[in-house]
């Protein structure tokens, strides 16, 4: 019910919800220095006259004091085979020769 008085609005003021924390920083021991690795890489393409065929080589090597790995790839291609069909040659079997019929 109505009590005849003036009611104040229900307003509350609070401090903003802000929290401050120390930054999360972790310090670790310095990383161990590993010995250097030696690497080498080479590639070569040898093409025939008229670029009808080619041989492609690729080699990569990684050497460390603990291991050694070598990867190599050799590919041979001949475009002349792909574009020129082999001639169709058919040979008949030789005729069978029997000894002549010879009667006495």
From Swiss-Prot:
Protein name according to UniProt: Cuticle protein 67, isoform B
Taxonomic superkingdom: Eukaryota
Per the record, what about its domains? The tetrapeptide (A-A-P-[AV]) repeats found throughout the protein are also present in many proteins constituting the protective envelope of other species.
Mark the sequence repeats by their residue spans: 7-10, 14-17, 21-24, 28-31, 85-88, 92-95, 98-101
Pfam families, per database record = Cuticle_3 (PF11018)
Role, per record = Component of the cuticle of migratory locust which contains more than 100 different structural proteins.
Keywords attached to this Swiss-Prot or TrEMBL record, sorted alphabetically, are: Cuticle, Repeat
Which GO molecular-function terms appear in the entry?
structural constituent of cuticle
